[in-house]
Amino acid sequence: MDHAGTMRRAYDLLNDGDVDGFGDLLADDFVEHEELPGLAPGKEGVKAFFRMYHAAFPDLRMEAQDVLPSGDKVVARARATGTHRGEFMGIPATGKRIDVQLVDIIRFGDDGLAREHWGVFDSMAMMQQLGVVPEGPPV
C-alpha cells in the first residue's frame, strides 16, 4: 500500500473505532508534534487521544477530502464530524454536533509505518459548536 493509501486506511480504522489497528500503522518510535496535554508522548499518547475522542464522540467520522503524497510525506485535508455524547476535556456531554476541518502531515519510514505527525485542528470552531465559546462576528 502506498503512503496515501495508508493515510486513508488510518482514517478508516479510526472511523471504525479500531484504535489498536490504527496504532499498528505507527512506528514504535512515532513522534507526535501536536501537543496532547496530559497524555503520554508518542504512539501510546496518540492512541489514548483517539480513545478519549471516541468516548466523547462515539460517532466520530474523519473524512479525507484531499490526500496529497510527496516523497516520504503525505498531507491530508480532512473533516471531522461527531455528536458530543460523553465528557470531553472537562466538558459534560452537550448532545451537539461538531463539523470541523483539520490538516494532517505524516512522514513515513521505509517500512511504510508512520514516523512523525504534524497537525492543525480547528479547535476554536469545535468549542463554538459545543457552545463552550461564543461565536464571534463574521470575518
Can you name each region flagged by the protein language model?
Residues 1-139:
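C-terminal and inter-domain tail/linker signature
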